[in-house]
Amino acid sequence: MAFDDLRSFLQELDDHGQLLKISEEVNAEPDLAAAANATGRIGDGAPALWFDNIRGFTDARVAMNTIGSWQNHAISLGLPPNAPVKKQIDEFIRRWDNFPIAPERRANPAWAQNTVDGDEINLFDILPLFRLNDGDGGFYLDKACVVSRDPLDPDNFGKQNVGIYRMEVKGKRKLGLQPVPMHDIALHLHKAEERGEDLPIAITLGNDPIITLMGATPLKYDQSEYEMAGALRESPYPIATAPLTGFDVPWGSEVILEGVIESRKREIEGPFGEFTGHYSGGRNMTVVRIDKVSYRTRPIFESLYLGMPWTEIDYLMGPATCVPLYQQLKAEFPEVQAVNAMYTHGLLAIISTKKRYGGFARAVGLRAMTTPHGLGYVKMVIMVDEDVDPFNLPQVMWALSSKVNPAGDLVQLPNMSVLELDPGSSPAGITDKLIIDATTPVAPDNRGHYSQPVVDSPETKAWAEKLTAMLAARK
């Protein structure tokens, strides 16, 4: 099932028993964030949360944790809620090959029902804002998609970027936005500022799950998130034209903010509790001026809790990181079998590969670190043989414990790039990277003294199926 907006997705979650509606009166702080945080502490199958009775707000509706479990992630892809994680990633990979599917332009978006312009804008009146962690420096929009275009090639649809970036609400029509240098919006901004120009942007809030997944997926610079969203949902993605910027925005969004990142203007933004499980301190970041707001009558505000993993961001980013890394590596190294980059935005990746010759696995690990996503995120790579499933952690631990000799199997690369939010980087944005080679050596590599490996007998698979069927029959 393809969802055209957040509301249809919430209804589907509700139909599957994966939306918990909380009708009792709650405080905006700390209850909303604490409840979303708690979903990561109650075991598998955590539901999405819906709040519509929030003390201090008038007629506010807040949704959280919408993709915050593997069940919800499966539903977002139109799969059965019980689809295994590996099945979800395999399906993501299969649909990726449908790219590109051109979007469908639609008229009369619901977000056009109400508009506010210029000095009449007051985001505090329109959005039910609240802090996500006690140490946050302010209110944040952290699940919105930001649309920007290449100032030197504005008509190139593929170079129009849709990405998710944290934004601090700093005034009635003023935001602070963090453009991570490795992300496309940072390149757009750099090109605009070189010309002494502001960078127009459109910010979309309350989106369907597929464009949210795409906003978190590291595509190539000229790959369209809307065309990839069509591939992922297996039907053309619905877009509409934003009235001020003329940008392409999701037809089904709840709220559209349009304005500019002001050229060469920086102010302190932060701190903010980040996906690393640590606060990022205050830093000089860009300033956004909002010039037009369009919003649906009685809009739904969606927010994303971040903190000590696992939280919703890990379910959102996990497959969205594994799949592009796999596709980009597979295109250059057909020997690559699978990529597990589900941990902390892919700061750690586990990659299984066949080996053409000695040293091959290390070359694959190095390439993973220099993909579009790897430049800023892939800090450590564990390379394993093709018969080791990167998603089966006991198998990975076996490979690490039985195949790694620290004397020769650790490749340390000094002074490499990483996003500044990595608390281990020093200075912020620079780190040593590490490849751990847990593969069996092939000629001319002569590490270790490996004998014939123990493998399953031919009858094991049949017996596994038989025992599984017998257990199922007892229930």
What positions do the PLM features span?
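Extended, highly charged
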Residues: M1-F272, G277-V287, D291-K475
